[in-house]
């Protein structure tokens, strides 16, 4: 099995911490499954030290961009990925494999005044909806977040 983990948000605060801990503990627990870490060019050495079953693959599309909607699925095809784990709420509808997604919260939808404009709100809401409907499993952090996901999706 070849699992891709989207690690492009490695340096973000909450999601970055989640990704770093996920990789740290997966490396301790699983030495057999092949993991592809989709990362930014500056993080190409991300897999070093995790184990021989971890490999970094550069994914240059920016998170939350229109480009990732096309480039990410294409990268998954090129890498023959079996399962994608998205550690944030964006899961392009054209993803060619099974997928799981982590949705930490819906704060950006609950407080849209902190987004740059209405288009950003619509994009965020559409991406959350697609991710929730498309993913085989959703990981979340609490019953409150679960209730919010159900409300917005």
What do these predicted ranges mean?
Residues 1-153:
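Carbohydrate transferase catalytic cores enriched for Leloir-type hexosyltransferases
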């Amino acid at each position: 099995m070849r699992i891709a983990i989207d690690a492009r948000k490695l340096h973000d605060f909450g999601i970055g911490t989640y990704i770093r801990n996920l990789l740290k503990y997966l490396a301790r627990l699983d030495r057999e499954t092949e993991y592809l870490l989709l990362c930014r060019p500056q993080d190409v050495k991300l897999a070093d030290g995790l184990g021989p079953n971890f490999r970094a693959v550069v994914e240059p599309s920016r998170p939350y961009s229109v480009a990732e909607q096309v480039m990410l699925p294409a990268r998954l095809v090129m890498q023959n990925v079996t399962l994608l784990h998205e550690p944030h709420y964006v899961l392009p509808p054209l993803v060619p494999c099974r997928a799981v997604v982590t949705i930490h919260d819906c704060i950006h939808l609950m407080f849209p005044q902190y987004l740059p404009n209405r288009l950003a709100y619509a994009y965020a809401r559409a991406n959350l909806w697609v991710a929730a409907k498309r993913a085989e499993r959703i990981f979340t952090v609490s019953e409150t977040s679960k209730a919010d996901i159900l409300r917005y999706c």
